[in-house]
Amino acid sequence: MTSIRVAFSRASSAASAVAEIAGQMAGFRPALVLCFAADAQDPAQLAAALRQAFPPPVALAGCTTAGEIGPDGYTNDSVVAIGFAAADFTAATVLIPGLSAFDLADCQRRVEDTLHRSTLQREALGFPNSLAFLLVDGLSLREEPVGRAVQLVLGDIPVVGGSAGDSLHFRQTQVFHDGSAQSDAAVLALISTDLPFRVVKTQHFQRTDERMVVTGARPAERVVTEINGFPAALEYARIVGVPVANLDPMAFAAYPVVVRIGGSEYVRSIQKVNPDHSLSFYCAIDEGIVLSRAQGLDALANLESALARVEEEIG
């Protein structure tokens, strides 16, 4: 029996999707089920159905998405569930609500309590390895402060995760936690295991020498108003060679920008062009940041190379 099982459904109703997922996990006893779902299904109904299909002590976490990875690769309008076998994993989860009025002390208290529960589980079973999985409401604009708060408590425990989406509608993104779906919230799963693992970070982009200095911004809104002293969208369009009218999600994906931090490069994803020719970003941005135009590499080859290195390390 494998330690991790993936289930997939394209059913249009939450009940049918969860029934298919439960069927694909028949005979598999999970400690944790992570669920990623398009907003075609009702999130509240989906979360409730998952709890009915996987009752306690199974831990549940997940979020709505802007696309999923299914058996045939990238897809949309589907539900993906990942089960972690109880024989090899333990999991403790916690909801971090009220992100619009983010309370650092409350967040850290919740994480500390969850870390205590996770430590008791891990020590009882003798599992030596731990990681944290964090999902944040993608419209809350709170990924960075939540991530920092979590990492401060967890110390050397690696934190991975991302933002909830809603098929690029930008109306309501939700996280799942133990049978409920909530906006303005984050969910954290602390996972321990006796299996070896590595955290893998890949991005199929390479920095060029063409730079863009953020000379005007509204950091609280993640909006860049000026690049190199010119209206942001106009200057970005000039540099990448795309008409402003053609700047859409596909163009932003084809012509990404990166920032260099601590010797590593990180993509700063652009969301949209605003009527005043400013640019909205998906992540933290501020005046003075130097962005570089990046060029795309072979995504599949990049991923295969990264996984091959991990296989060499841990077998």
Label every model-predicted segment.
Residues 1-32, 36-53, 57-66, 71-315:
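Small-residue-enriched flexible segments
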